[in-house]
């Protein structure tokens, strides 16, 4: 038997691809969760408002009172459909448990997915926002872990430099030079 030791750069590259895949899925799930959470909150506000108008502030006009009751009924039916169709679970509950489920699946490989918090007021998000992979010291040597962190940070630094050079080239070109 020959003991095959894989090239560490190819392993780092594959880990980077895996991390990018996890990051993309995590960010997509967070956007979907925010969208449906806004829908869910607006639906709750809708039901509370029309419930208040139907039960506590009854209108003296029967047509307006009937409209309030129909709006409340539509809101309750929509809320029940949202729960019983499974949309609540797949759009709000599952995205918040994504990292836990990935960590359970990756436990065998001694790799963890960790959320990197980014301030909400930061306009330009870094390239590695969302999540990143951490190698466990149980299975991996300290040199491999440090090599992975160095490879990862140098990769994102090179991507950042490339994006900055592209932006500076685009901003340095003037509209008059493009027309000539």
From Swiss-Prot:
Membrane-traversing stretches: 36-56, 68-88
Protein's UniProt keywords contain Membrane: yes
Principal cellular location given in the protein's record: endoplasmic reticulum
Single annotated GO MF: protein phosphatase regulator activity
One Pfam entry name: Spo7
Matching InterPro entries: Spo7
Localization annotation: Endoplasmic reticulum membrane; Nucleus membrane
Keyword match Transmembrane: yes
Signal peptide: none
Domain of life: Eukaryota
Record's GO cellular component terms: cytoplasm; endoplasmic reticulum; endoplasmic reticulum membrane; Nem1-Spo7 phosphatase complex; nuclear membrane
Keyword annotations from UniProtKB, A to Z: Endoplasmic reticulum, Glycoprotein, Membrane, Nucleus, Transmembrane, Transmembrane helix
Membrane topology qualifier: Multi-pass membrane protein
Glycosylated residue positions: 163, 169
GO BP terms in the entry: negative regulation of phospholipid biosynthetic process; nuclear envelope organization; signaling
Reported function: Probable regulatory component of the nem1-spo7 complex which acts as a phosphatase and may be required for proper nuclear membrane morphology.
Known partners and oligomeric status: Component of the nem1-spo7 complex.
Protein known as: Sporulation-specific protein spo7
Species of the source: Schizosaccharomyces pombe (strain 972 / ATCC 24843) (Fission yeast)
Taxonomic path: Eukaryota, Fungi, Dikarya, Ascomycota, Taphrinomycotina
Underlying gene: spo7
């Amino acid at each position: 038997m020959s003991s095959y030791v894989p090239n560490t750069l190819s392993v780092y590259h594959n880990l980077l691809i895996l991390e990018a895949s996890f990051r993309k899925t995590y960010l997509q799930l967070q956007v979907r969760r925010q969208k449906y959470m806004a829908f869910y909150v607006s639906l709750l506000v809708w039901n509370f408002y029309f419930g208040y108008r139907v039960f506590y502030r009854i209108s003296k006009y029967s047509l307006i009172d009937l409209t309030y009751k129909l709006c409340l009924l539509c809101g309750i039916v929509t809320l029940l459909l949202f729960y019983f169709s499974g949309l609540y679970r797949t759009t709000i509950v599952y995205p918040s448990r994504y990292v836990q489920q990935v960590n359970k699946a990756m436990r065998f490989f001694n790799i963890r997915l960790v959320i990197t918090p980014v301030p909400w007021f930061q306009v330009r998000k870094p390239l590695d926002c969302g999540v990143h992979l951490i190698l466990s010291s149980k299975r991996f040597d300290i040199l491999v872990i440090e090599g992975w962190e160095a490879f990862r940070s140098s990769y994102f630094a090179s991507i950042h430099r490339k994006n900055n050079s592209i932006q500076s080239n685009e901003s340095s070109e003037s509209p008059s030079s493009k027309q000539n």
